[in-house]
A protein has these predicted regions:
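Flexible N-terminal pre-Rossmann segment of NAD(P)-dependent oxidoreductases
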Residues: 1-8
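Conserved glycine-rich Rossmann-like NAD(P)H-binding loop of the short-chain dehydrogenase/reductase
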Residues: 30-46
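The beta1-alpha1 cofactor-binding region of Rossmann-like NAD(H)/NADP(H)-dependent oxidoreductases
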Residues: 57-69
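Aromatic pocket-lining residues of Rossmann-like dinucleotide-binding sites
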Residues: 27
Length: 89
């Protein structure tokens, strides 16, 4: 089922593989802007297909770097509506 959540945004940790990648895909398909945080890039093919996904390479144990990326995303989208933590899952 495809819904329209245009204007909503999500931050996903561990977003480049397994469950995180699938969640990123589903949220993107429902018009949610997604900040994908991971050490591994999901690849240009994925990012070109899911245009409202934005990838940032970050180690989630580095709080300063994590905060920097999340604050920039929040400023751009005015809010963060969803947080999905899949790092290490």
């Amino acid at each position: 089922m495809k819904l329209n959540y245009k204007g909503k945004s999500a931050v996903i940790t561990g977003a480049s593989g397994g469950m995180g990648l699938e969640i990123s895909k589903k949220l993107s398909q429902n018009n949610i802007s997604v900040l994908m945080l991971d050490l591994k890039n999901p690849g240009n093919e994925f990012l070109n297909k899911y245009k409202n996904c934005e990838f940032k390479k970050v180690n989630v144990t580095n709080f300063k770097s994590l905060k920097l990326h999340i604050e920039a995303f929040n400023k751009k989208h005015k809010s963060i509506d969803y947080l999905v933590n899949t790092t290490g899952v």
